[in-house]
């Protein structure tokens, strides 16, 4: 038999093995989904609260991916300015042999980071009084209130203040709907990341891989998968930072316990990527009772995502083998590769021109959070 015939047979065998593996993995996930409620009922209250928070974050990130909604983002930004910056970055790479592994998509991300921070979004320490237009010592907090019953803007909480100069109430609704944030163009880290991800997804297209990163100690950022660098890249739109996972522990001096990345197809514990100094690691058992239970339940949540992804494919394509192959290539293989490569941590070069300490938020606030760079 010719070598070409052998290659064909080996390729056919490999495809059969992949299909069989994908089918077993899918059936296992379906079975796990049926047991999830029973599994949850066995957790203690501490672990239940933690898991419910993860579910809430995961569900929030399933929204606002419809193409017609994403088009709204493109109408709200200065595309000409962004692409002018992208072209400049690409020219510098070619003329100065700068950043050889970065591709055009990476330059779009870099330029959006710069544009978003410096030209589009604004940080809010305290809301501005509608009458005197001031937002300093005249604005004093008076408590918080819950969201309205009809809540299209997805308000999580309303911070209430009073302007002592004008003697009027001032409110600061914490919006989560990125379409609303395209109007307000302001907020703190949650608003910044929600709006940035929405615009980034619109710019890069539906095939791009973008995920939301949640830290248990009250910070959020995001990542995208770079086809040029072939790995997940850290992005912090509040700070305008690209590929600096050491930022929080080694620059800010922030102590953290957990960091989770929420993607379309799976949730990943990325604590080891971002908690880069042992003295900045808060004991995870301060927030949960059992590390094993948390890991097992995250596996269950990932099974849910896998089943949902396959079900959505099956709605539009009836070829089972083709769907199973796609499931393997688009979900199982990527997830398994990241789990396997967690042991081989990539050393990311530190950018020395980043200022010390957190740059967003006033000095008193960043100091109270242990993010001012003074260890």
Language model segments and positions:
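Hydrophobic/aromatic-lined pockets within catalytic cores
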Residues: 117, 121, 200-205, 226
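Generic recognition of flexible, low-complexity loop/linker segments
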Residues: 196-197, 208-211, 248
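Short, well-structured beta-strand/strand-turn elements
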Residues: 201-217
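Catalytic nucleophile-His microenvironment captured as a short glycine-rich beta-strand/loop
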Residues: 197-201, 218-228
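Short N-terminal edge-element motif at the start of the domain
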Residues: 185-203
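Alpha-helical and coiled-coil interaction segments, frequently adjacent to or embedded
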Residues: 1-191, 214, 229-375
């Amino acid at each position: 038999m010719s070598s070409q015939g052998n290659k064909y047979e080996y390729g056919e065998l490999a495809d059969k093995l992949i299909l069989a593996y994908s089918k077993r993995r899918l059936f296992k996930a379906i079975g796990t989904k049926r047991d999830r409620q029973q599994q949850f009922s066995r957790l203690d209250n501490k672990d239940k609260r933690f898991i419910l928070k993860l579910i809430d974050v995961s569900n929030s990130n399933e929204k606002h991916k419809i193409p017609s909604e994403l088009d709204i983002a493109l109408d709200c930004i200065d595309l000409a300015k962004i692409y002018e910056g992208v072209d400049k970055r690409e020219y510098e790479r070619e003329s100065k042999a700068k950043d050889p592994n970065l591709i055009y998509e990476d330059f779009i991300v870099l330029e959006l980071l710069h544009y978003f921070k410096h030209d589009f979004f604004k940080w809010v320490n305290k809301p501005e009084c509608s009458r005197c237009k001031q937002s300093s010592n005249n604005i004093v907090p008076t408590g918080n209130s819950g969201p309205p019953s009809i809540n299209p803007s997805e308000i999580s909480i309303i911070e209430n203040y009073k302007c002592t100069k004008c003697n009027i109430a001032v409110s600061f609704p914490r919006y989560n709907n990125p379409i609303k944030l395209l109007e307000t163009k302001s907020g703190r880290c949650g608003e910044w990341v929600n709006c940035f991800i929405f615009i980034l997804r619109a710019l890069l297209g539906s095939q791009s891989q973008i995920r939301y990163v949640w830290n248990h100690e009250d910070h959020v950022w995001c990542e995208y998968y770079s086809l040029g660098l072939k790995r997940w890249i850290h992005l912090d739109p509040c700070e305008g930072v690209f590929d600096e996972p050491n930022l929080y522990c080694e620059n800010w001096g922030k102590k953290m316990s957990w960091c989770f990345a929420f993607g379309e197809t799976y949730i990943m514990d990325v604590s080891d990527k971002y908690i880069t100094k042992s003295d900045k690691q808060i004991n995870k058992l301060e927030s949960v009772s059992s590390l094993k239970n948390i890991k097992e339940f995250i596996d269950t949540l990932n099974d849910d995502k896998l089943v949902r992804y396959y079900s959505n494919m099956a709605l539009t394509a009836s070829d089972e083998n083709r769907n199973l192959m796609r499931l393997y290539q688009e979900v199982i293989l990527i997830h398994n590769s990241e789990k396997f490569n967690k042991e081989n941590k990539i050393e990311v070069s530190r950018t020395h021109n980043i200022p010390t300490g957190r740059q967003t938020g006033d000095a008193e606030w960043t100091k109270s959070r242990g993010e001012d760079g003074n260890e």
